[in-house]
Amino acid sequence: MSRRLGAAAAVLLLWLAVLTFAFHGYYGGRLGSARRRNILLQHPALALHLPTRKMLLAVASFDDASSPSSLTTTDRHHHHHRHHGHHHHRGHDRWNRKGVPPTAAGPGEEVDPRFGVQKRLVPTGPNPLHH
């Protein structure tokens, strides 16, 4: 039983080493882009042996974008950010999240329009805990 456990642990460590090597590259991510470019210009065959995270992410995002199930969520996500700030946040000064209109409060008794509760006075100035 202990021999099987030792073999399983060795296989697990081997897979972790392979995955770490695959994700961090041959030089451990310490090879700068200018230095990498110079090496690749001198030895173009090394381009296949020096995978970068950007290349891996580009391949993964290309594969995800080509699947039909991800097209609708990707389009919806981009649409939201394209119009972000134009008309989505117009009514925050009139209504809060719960749909309750703000009341007419006097000075010092302001109601937060987002949450519909009384605003608390927050002290400003230097932090007394920092000397």
Swiss-Prot record:
Renumbered residue ranges of the record's region Disordered: 67-131
Q: What is its main location?
A: secreted
Keyword Secreted belongs to the record: yes
Alphabetical UniProt keywords: Developmental protein, Differentiation, Secreted, Signal
Q: Where is it expressed, tissue-wise?
A: Expressed in all aerial apical meristems, including the floral and inflorescence meristems in the reproductive phase and the shoot apical meristem in the vegetative phase. Also detected in the primordia of lateral organs such as the leaf and the floral organs.
Task: Check the record and name the InterPro entries matching this protein.
Answer: CLE9-13 (IPR039618)
* GO biological process, any: cell differentiation
One annotated Gene Ontology cellular component of this protein: extracellular region
Q: Where in the cell is it found?
A: Secreted
Would you indicate the residue range of the signal peptide? 1-22
> Where is the sequence biased in composition, kind Basic residues?
76-97
What does the protein in this record do? Answer: Involved in the maintenance of the floral meristem and of the shoot apical meristem in the vegetative phase. Suppresses the fon2 mutation and acts independently of FON1. In Oryza sativa subsp. japonica, the protein has a single amino acid substitution at the putative processing site of the signal peptide and is inactive.
- UniProt family annotation: Belongs to the CLV3/ESR signal peptide family.
- Identify this protein by name: Protein FON2 SPARE1
Q: Which organism is it from?
A: Oryza sativa subsp. indica (Rice)
Instruction: Name the gene.
Output: FOS1
